[in-house]
């Protein structure tokens, strides 16, 4: 199952991306998280940062040789803050840190944009994470190719 957690790319440079996700009650994962107090699940906030980070890395010249999709390799120092309720938007900013051997070290922060709010937007989640190419054995790759044809 795939959830697209990037509605719009607001800014994109080789070192930074800013995206926006509008959260609505139409999102199927909100139906039971939680029934009487719907909020965006924390793992979906992290996934929004991962999807933004993936777009950032894939837009760079030094990622042109990728043979496999980028996947989440590691999460560090993840901190959650404010709940994200339907009607609000999640503004995600991801910055590229070091490019390691076959890995990209990223730092992300997602803030809550509530309708009519003034002042600084509260942080929903922040942390560091690593994206790397998926590691698939040759047997799995053959099976994957047979299934997708």
Question: How would you name each of these model-derived features?
Answer:
Residues 1-40:
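Catalytic strand-loop segment that frames the active site of acyl-thioester-processing enzymes
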Residues 3-5, 90-91, 104:
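Hydrophobic core residues within well-ordered beta-strands of beta-rich domains
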Residues 6-10, 76, 81, 95-97, ...:
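Conserved positions in beta-strands of structured domains
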Residues 14-16, 85-87, 95-149:
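HotDog/MaoC-like acyl-thioester-processing domains
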Residues 21, 93-96:
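Short, hydrophobic/aromatic-enriched beta-strand segments in well-ordered soluble domains
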Residues 31-58, 69-72:
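Compact, glycine-rich, soluble single-domain proteins
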Residues 52-91, 128-131:
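Hydrophobic beta-strand-centered segment that forms part of the acyl-chain substrate-binding groove
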